[in-house]
Amino acid sequence: MAEPVSPLKHFVLAKKAITAIFDQLLEFVTEGSHFVEATYKNPELDRIATEDDLVEMQGYKDKLSIIGEVLSRRHMKVAFFGRTSSGKSSVINAMLWDKVLPSGIGHITNCFLSVEGTDGDKAYLMTEGSDEKKSVKTVNQLAHALHMDKDLKAGCLVRVFWPKAKCALLRDDLVLVDSPGTDVTTELDSWIDKFCLDADVFVLVANSESTLMNTEKHFFHKVNERLSKPNIFILNNRWDASASEPEYMEDVRRQHMERCLHFLVEELKVVNALEAQNRIFFVSAKEVLSARKQKAQGMPESGVALAEGFHARLQEFQNFEQIFEECISQSAVKTKFEQHTIRAKQILATVKNIMDSVNLAAEDKRHYSVEEREDQIDRLDFIRNQMNLLTLDVKKKIKEVTEEVANKVSCAMTDEICRLSVLVDEFCSEFHPNPDVLKIYKSELNKHIEDGMGRNLADRCTDEVNALVLQTQQEIIENLKPLLPAGIQDKLHTLIPCKKFDLSYNLNYHKLCSDFQEDIVFRFSLGWSSLVHRFLGPRNAQRVLLGLSEPIFQLPRSLASTPTAPTTPATPDNASQEELMITLVTGLASVTSRTSMGIIIVGGVIWKTIGWKLLSVSLTMYGALYLYERLSWTTHAKERAFKQQFVNYATEKLRMIVSSTSANCSHQVKQQIATTFARLCQQVDITQKQLEEEIARLPKEIDQLEKIQNNSKLLRNKAVQLENELENFTKQFLPSSNEES
């Protein structure tokens, strides 16, 4: 980098450099703030970035925006103070090489005036509290404007904007502030607060025709109290007056020098004695302004009448300007930029810590997510394998339980069938042979038997079956419970309640015995049909009594004579003795049923054989027995016969449904247990689905975490680069602070 011509360029370059750095810093912090905000507000990335991190980053973004605006308005500021008519305005004009501010006889600065450059080609001024730009073409117009504004007080500020093209000094962000005399007001504290706290250099313009006054010293003592070691220059103006008394000039100069040194070194203690030598100057601003105006017009500097020693005074003024420019540029860079540089380093250090914490949190989360994904895959495989094994075990268990239930119900039902007669005898209701009454009687008897058998079966089986079902359900739950999440395990008693199982036997007894036909007609025990039933059984007797009139074999045509060629009845070779008996009786019945002659013939045969007395006795006894049985055939006897017939019929029917009833009960048990298992399987399926979704989600989360790690590392590297730029700025523009650090 080429060495700048003017020391003031040092500030300009520093301002440009620090502004560029802070623009990058603001862009960087904005990017980091968006990154932290996106990370913090991502619901899938819990505890990666905290709310405090986000608040801190957003706070830095706002602060850097403000600092950027402040830096853009930063400039070097020099404030001129002194007694009234000490030549403050003349010094400013001399430094500007033009009569910018009103000065000289009759012109007294009655308020604060700041002179700064403008890029335009027209001068203008702005008063405090107004944004109006008042055009000013000449110094006289400026003086007139200031004089005519009655609202301007000593504590007001009027900003004068002078074209930079007309004054080189104003091109380098330098603002010169003129002030009223320190001896015209007591509001020194308000002046300091309003105009001095941001000043880089103070110039005390003293009248060399007199010594430093207490009012001047008092003001700078107050400045020294508010600012740490302010940069103060003392200009002993109007030194050209000493040319009229050359014999006293050195003594007066030495006297002024001693008093100024004492003031700076001993009283204010802002510099040491050696440094103070370069802070005190003896000049004539009026002479310098006149000479420079001459030079600006192309005429020699000494073209006007000047006092003796002018060149020495001009050289000293130029020395003052050189040292002043070096001092103010260094001081302004330090005061305007050093704290911002330190603050920027602190912000970068904090941002690096935030990025490091985000990186570490993302790394821990990513490592945890990788392990969690592996665990979820292992658990999913474990659940699937266990479900296959448990399904087989449950099927086997269900088969065992249903077989046991079927056996229990079958045994209990067989026992109840054996006790059916007792249950029928317990039934009491009005009995009458009338068909309508019998219908009601049978209906009530069916209901009584169905309720009784159902109750007895429930008493014998329900509790045992229920206990068996509950035990089996509990075993299944305990086996599948480890496959479910802890939260679901705690809620299993509500999701799958193990209620008492009510077994339904569903005998449907009414339909079962709906085709029962009672037979309560009186039959003599020695009657023909009774004997047939007794000897042949009900089925064969039915065949005989239903009218098998045609005999299977032929009887002899003549019973009295003996045939010459008797024929033997043709019977099948494989006919049994029972079938032969049926054939004989049927044949006999056929004969007796054809004609009443059979009775006479049989009676005659018996009478011839045993005699009439024995026959009479037999008939008497037979008739007495018939009469007894006929009189004993009461309604109660009919009811007993009815119940016995019903028991026999129902027993046969119930034995036919024992297997189906037990199978139905076992099916109910199977359904109950299978339902419980299905609900558990549903919960396991939900768990598997959740695991599958989690396994599918975790890779995306891992990718997000890797991106966050990469972004945090990238942002941290940017922070390091900005730190390096700040360090280079410090080395280049703030060497003293760099050495101190």
From Swiss-Prot:
Residues 371-408, 679-734 form a coiled coil. Changing W239A: Abolishes GTP binding and GTPase activity. Loss of function in mitochondrial fusion. It holds the Pfam family Dynamin_N. Residues 82-89 are annotated as: G1 motif. Residues 72-321 form the Dynamin-type G domain. Changing H107A: Loss of function in mitochondrial fusion. Abolishes GTPase activity, but has no effect on GTP binding. GO terms for cellular component: membrane; mitochondrial outer membrane; mitochondrion; outer mitochondrial membrane protein complex. Ubiquitinated by non-degradative ubiquitin by PRKN. Deubiquitination by USP30 inhibits mitochondrial fusion. Ubiquitinated by MARCHF5. When mitochondria are depolarized and dysfunctional, it is ubiquitinated by a SCF (SKP1-CUL1-F-box protein) E3 ubiquitin-protein ligase complex that contains FBXO7 and PRKN. The keyword RNA-binding does not apply. The chain crosses the membrane at residues 585-605, 609-629. It catalyses: GTP + H2O = GDP + phosphate + H(+). It is a multi-pass membrane protein. Keywords: Coiled coil, Cytoplasm, GTP-binding, Hydrolase, Membrane, Mitochondrion, Mitochondrion outer membrane, Nucleotide-binding, Transmembrane, Transmembrane helix, Ubl conjugation. Residues 606-608 are mitochondrial intermembrane. Its main location: mitochondrion. A truncated MFN1 construct containing the GTPase domain and the associated helix bundle is a monomer in the absence of bound GTP and a homodimer in the GTP-bound form; GDP cannot replace GTP and induce dimerization. A helix bundle is formed by helices from the N-terminal and the C-terminal part of the protein. The GTPase domain cannot be expressed by itself, without the helix bundle. Rearrangement of the helix bundle and/or of the coiled coil domains may bring membranes from adjacent mitochondria into close contact, and thereby play a role in mitochondrial fusion. Belongs to the TRAFAC class dynamin-like GTPase superfamily. Dynamin/Fzo/YdjA family. Mitofusin subfamily. PANTHER family: MITOFUSIN-1, TRANSMEMBRANE GTPASE FZO1. This is Mitofusin-1. The lineage of its organism: Eukaryota, Metazoa, Chordata, Craniata, Vertebrata.
